[in-house]
Each structure stands twice: as structure tokens, then as C-alpha cells.
A protein has these predicted regions:
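Short intrinsically disordered terminal tails
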Residues: 1, 176-177
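Non-heme Fe(II)/2-oxoglutarate
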Residues: 1-71
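Catalytic core of non-heme Fe(II) oxygenases with the double-stranded beta-helix
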Residues: 59-176
């Protein structure tokens, strides 16, 4: 089975997390799907770069590329962007990349999971302050955010080229401070 992703919980420090939370008010209950590049997005990307550099995962080639292929994505309640593509069954594939969940709270019953096809896991819950590295050529999609959700699914995503495949996170996660 293909390794779908590497997950790192509590990715950013509480100070940085609190700064993010103070900047996402407009996204929490929006009724439309959004992909935005704002000053908050730039700040979060800088923090992600810092953390990935500490973990020896950052690739210098991404510095100029990530601003072009990243955004804050907001998935409101009921939105189903994936299943409208019947040929792929609600999944798509990229050259690898990451998703960092910035919504303030999440309950598993709200859906919105990151889902995978033909991988070692079927889905990953969008837990707040969770960083997920999606390996290259892995079919993935987004589950529908259910009507019981009290806030939207909000994530910072990036899909740079030249990404690496990570088969195990054991050593990487264990070095995270």
C-alpha cells in the first residue's frame, strides 16, 4: 500500500496559533468556497517554512514557488467540490504538497476529512493545528463538511513541484519540539 501522508499535530506554537485565530474571523461562517492570499496567508507560510526548515524538510526551490501555488482555502458547510467529477470519484492527484488546518475547533462528526484512495489510510481528520504532508501521486479528496459543523473547514494549502515522498514520519515527528 502507498503511504498517503505524514501528519504532525500541534505544528505551530501557541503564540503563532493564537495570532492565526485572531485573523480568521471572516472565514469561520462564510457561505462560499474561498481561496485567498492575504497578509495572514503570507505570515502562515513563513511560519510553515520556519518549522519545515527546523525539521530538515524545506526545499529552497519552494521559496518562490509556494506563493504561486498556495492559499487559504475555506470549505463551507455542505460544499462538495469533489464528487462533481464522476470520472475520478471525488479524488484528484498532485505532485505532493501540504495542508495545514487553521480552523479553531473540529468534531469528527462534521466530516470534511482528507480522504485517500488505494493508500495505507482511508482518511485523516482535519484537526486544528495539524500539518499534513500529502505524498506525490497520491489520490486524495475532501469530504463534505456536514450541516452540524459550527464553523467552516479552513486550511492553508500548497502544492509545489519537486516534492519528496516520505515513507515514514517516525524520525521526523520525534524530532519536533
Amino acid at each position: 500500500m502507498t503511504t498517503a501522508a505524514v501528519v504532525i499535530d500541534n505544528f505551530l506554537t501557541n503564540d503563532k496559533w493564537n495570532t492565526i485565530q485572531s485573523g480568521i474571523t471572516d472565514y469561520l461562517n462564510s457561505f462560499t468556497y474561498m481561496e485567498e492570499r492575504t497578509s495572514l496567508h503570507t505570515q502562515i507560510q513563513d511560519w510553515i517554512e520556519e518549522q519545515l526548515t527546523l525539521l530538515n524538510l524545506w526545499q529552497s526551490s519552494w521559496k518562490n514557488e509556494i506563493p504561486l501555488f498556495s492559499s487559504i482555502n475555506v470549505a463551507p458547510v455542505g460544499l462538495d467540490r469533489e464528487s462533481s467529477d464522476p470520472s475520478n470519484g471525488g479524488y484528484h492527484v498532485e505532485s505532493g504538497g501540504y495542508i495545514y488546518y487553521i480552523h479553531p475547533t473540529w468534531d469528527s462528526s462534521w466530516g470534511g476529512h482528507l480522504k485517500f484512495k488505494n493508500c495505507d489510510v482511508e482518511q485523516i481528520e482535519p484537526t486544528p493545528n495539524r500539518f499534513v504532508w500529502v505524498n506525490p501521486k497520491v489520490w486524495h479528496g475532501i469530504g463534505v463538511v456536514e450541516s452540524g459543523a459550527t464553523n467552516n473547514r479552513i486550511a492553508v494549502v500548497a502544492w509545489p513541484t519537486g516534492t519528496m515522498e516520505y515513507s515514514s514520519a517516525d524520525l521526523i515527528i520525534n524530532t519536533l519540539v
